[in-house]
């Protein structure tokens, strides 16, 4: 009997030994999400905040997500939903979400809506909301309390942590072998709204007190790589190793923001470490980024991991794996560059789901080795054809889902995922994101400058599409795979030798099982970009290049040769 029990126990342990839980690992030049031992590209979408509170509602959503070509879904789990009565946990909803995802062959990332969601404590249990004496709030100027739990309360932290650890323990029990859940988002867009910092008595005392040595030590150790605005603020105040917050960072709202960032980082970092002690899944935060109309911290959630304060978060919350931006603004390429840092791999957990979202996904994954992309509110299918970002998309839901811009982009990215992930690790991939304000981009890759521009009508070059995008992978000497939509692509050598790059062979095709399967051999009208060959030759161009139409993203393979 004992032998049988031992064998059963060993058998139960085998899946864990054979397939480690999901993790972030550096592979070559990229940090990648590893699932069941293999790099994984998260082609994701996030449901609306309360969608996951109803399994009946989610039953109508799962099939749509499959049709949209998602492989990963971001869903909320609220503290209020799992601990409606203090000390009594109910994970029925969690188990139902796991079952729904597994039935539809989808992975999950759970969003822990605990102390804060969009800065406000709206998803905490009622027993927390009703007991302000025990669970203190933040105060703003004038002594007014707001519905935002204080970061400085040990009781707030301990209570949220207990619930979160119970949740992670449950995940370990029900998913350690299945690996349905890939990552955890810790809270949601934290930070104080309505003031630049907490004005409670506890916060005023902390602000007047010394900056923790963990932060000043981090600044000293990483002074050469700090975000420039943070480094300049610290150095302009004397680069002090000790002092009050005003003495170390100078007076002003930016110092208030740094102070709040430290407090939020310590709170979320402590929770993350406690959860990882039970079940060490990767954990990220998401950020409400500064909007053009914002005049200062407090208009956006002060303390959120903004570009200014990511270093503060790295110092205060080392257990958190990455800080991710929610990007709805048009300058997507700027924001991805500001968040993708050597110590901060890129993931975009909220963004657009229309044609702009398709371009965003290609750019983040190709240019910044993003581990994934996720438009928000994906259960509202009108977001696939949105006329404008935001809760009111201005569009009706499409009749079919799979042929919309983002699902078609996801289908091609899924097909190319092995090649993309390999190229991310090798550093042989780049991307272009184009619109009428930025109609062309040059990419330096391998021994060539790759010129990507919006696809032009050969008879009327002024006719260009509104959006175009491309991923370029260097596969060997003079060999490239290019995937894109509504762009045209030319190549120019950037090493000594003949000045003009010609197209030796161009193939349309697809990837199957990670291998290239050639289809049509493209030539003639397929690749002619410019009838003015004399003008092209004067610019060291052949007049030919790759053309990608607007009826859906496609991939081509090109082999180049050089001549003069």
Where are these regions (language model features)?
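Aromatic-lined substrate-binding rim segments of carbohydrate-active enzymes
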Residues: 57-132, 261-278
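Catalytic-core region of carbohydrate-active enzymes that cleave or remodel glycosidic bonds
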Residues: 106, 268-281, 308-420
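Polysaccharide-binding and catalytic clefts of secreted carbohydrate-active enzymes
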Residues: 135-310
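Conserved, mostly hydrophobic/aromatic
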Residues: 37, 65, 73, 101, ...
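Aromatic- and carboxylate-lined catalytic core of secreted/periplasmic carbohydrate-active enzymes
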Residues: 362-498, 507-510
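C-terminal beta-sandwich/jelly-roll accessory domains of carbohydrate-active enzymes
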Residues: 457-463, 480-564
């Amino acid at each position: 009997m004992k032998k049988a029990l031992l064998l059963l126990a060993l058998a139960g342990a085998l899946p864990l030994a054979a397939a480690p839980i999901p993790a972030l690992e550096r592979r070559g030049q990229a940090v990648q999400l590893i699932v069941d031992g293999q790099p994984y590209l998260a082609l994701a979408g996030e449901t609306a905040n309360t969608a996951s509170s109803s399994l009946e509602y989610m039953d109508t959503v799962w099939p749509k997500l499959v049709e949209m070509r998602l492989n990963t879904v971001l869903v909320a789990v609220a503290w209020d939903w799992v601990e409606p009565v203090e000390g009594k946990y109910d994970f029925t909803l969690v188990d139902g979400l796991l079952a729904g995802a597994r039935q539809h062959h989808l992975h999950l990332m759970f969003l822990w809506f605990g102390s804060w969601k969009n800065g406000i404590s709206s998803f905490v249990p009622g027993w927390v909301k009703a007991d302000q004496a025990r669970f203190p709030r933040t105060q703003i100027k004038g002594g007014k309390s707001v519905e935002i739990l204080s970061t400085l309360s040990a009781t707030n932290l301990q209570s949220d942590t207990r619930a979160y650890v119970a949740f992670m323990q449950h995940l370990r029990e029900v998913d350690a072998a299945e690996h349905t859940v890939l990552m955890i988002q810790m809270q949601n867009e934290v930070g104080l709204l309505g003031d630049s910092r907490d004005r409670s008595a506890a916060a005023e005392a902390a602000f007047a007190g010394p900056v923790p040595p963990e932060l000043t030590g981090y600044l000293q150790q990483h002074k050469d790589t700090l975000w420039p605005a943070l480094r300049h603020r610290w150095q302009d105040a004397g680069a002090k190793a000790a002092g009050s917050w005003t003495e170390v960072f100078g007076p002003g709202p930016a110092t208030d923001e740094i102070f709040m960032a430290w407090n939020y980082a310590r709170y979320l970092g402590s929770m993350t470490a406690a959860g990882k002690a039970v079940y060490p899944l990767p954990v990220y935060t998401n950020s409400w980024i500064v909007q053009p109309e914002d005049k200062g911290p407090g208009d956006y959630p002060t303390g959120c991991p903004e570009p200014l304060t990511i270093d503060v978060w790295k110092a205060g919350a080392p257990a958190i794996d990455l800080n991710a931006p929610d990007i709805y603004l048009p300058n997507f390429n700027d924001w991805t560059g500001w968040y993708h840092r050597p110590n901060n791999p890129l993931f975009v957990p909220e963004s657009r789901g229309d044609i702009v979202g398709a371009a965003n996904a290609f750019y983040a994954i190709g240019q910044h080795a993003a581990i994934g992309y996720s438009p928000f509110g994906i259960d509202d299918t009108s977001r696939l054809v949105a006329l404008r970002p935001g809760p009111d998309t201005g569009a009706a839901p499409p009749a079919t889902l799979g042929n919309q811009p983002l699902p078609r982009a996801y289908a091609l990215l899924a097909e190319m995922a092995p090649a993309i992930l390999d190229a991310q690790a090798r550093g042989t991939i780049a991307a272009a994101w184009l619109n009428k304000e930025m109609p062309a981009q040059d990419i330096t890759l391998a021994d060539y400058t790759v010129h990507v521009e919006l696809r032009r009508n050969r008879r009327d070059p002024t006719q260009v599409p509104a959006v175009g995008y491309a991923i370029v992978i260097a596969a060997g000497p003079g060999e490239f795979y290019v995937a894109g939509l509504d762009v045209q692509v030319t190549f120019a050598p950037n090493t000594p030798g003949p000045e003009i790059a010609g197209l030796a062979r161009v193939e349309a095709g697809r990837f199957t099982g990670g291998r290239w399967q050639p289809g049509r051999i493209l030539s003639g009208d397929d690749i002619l970009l410019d009838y003015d060959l004399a003008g092209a030759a004067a610019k060291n161009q052949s007049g030919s290049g790759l053309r990608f139409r607007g009826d859906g993203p496609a991939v081509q393979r090109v082999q180049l040769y050089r001549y003069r």
